[in-house]
């Protein structure tokens, strides 16, 4: 059975990480710093998925910035399908970042948890790092999500 190929630029184990916190706690700023650092360090592709068009001037041109509203992504299943499509279409992806995941998933925490669970498997198969911000109190998150902070 074909399970995909890992990025030829990925030299170490993949990382799946969440940045969780209340609104205004600096999650997006942290994500922007990580996107720009990854884009500067990698020879592969870095993708940043966002809700709306707010990060245009903050994210380096070396990273591909994708607005979910332009593609009609309004649910957890749509977000996962989009990420899977990115991974399937570009085998040089080393990092995928998602900002405002809870907003993209229409504030469905169970849906966000489902995306995290499925992307962990996808990340191992295709060999990319994954970082996502979630605007919620950490107490509202599952144990699986807390373990990825």
PLM regions with names:
Residues 1-14:
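Short, Lys/Arg-enriched N-terminal segments with co-localized hydrophobic residues
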Residues 12-87, 141-144:
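Conserved P-loop
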């Amino acid at each position: 059975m074909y399970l995909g190929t890992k990025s030829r630029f990925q030299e170490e184990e993949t990382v799946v990480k969440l940045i969780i916190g209340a609104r205004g706690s600096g999650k997006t700023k942290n994500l922007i710093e990580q996107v720009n650092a990854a884009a500067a360090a990698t020879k592969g592709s870095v993708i940043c998925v966002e809700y709306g068009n707010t990060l245009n001037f903050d994210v380096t041109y070396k990273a591909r910035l994708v607005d979910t509203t332009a593609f009609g992504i309004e649910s957890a299943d749509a977000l996962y399908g989009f990420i899977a499509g990115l991974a399937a279409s570009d085998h040089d992806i080393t990092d995928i970042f998602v900002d405002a995941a809870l907003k993209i998933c229409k504030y469905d925490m169970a849906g966000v948890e489902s995306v995290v669970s499925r992307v962990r498997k996808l990340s191992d198969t295709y060999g990319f790092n994954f970082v996502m911000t979630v605007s919620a109190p950490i107490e509202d998150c599952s144990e699986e999500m807390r373990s990825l902070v």
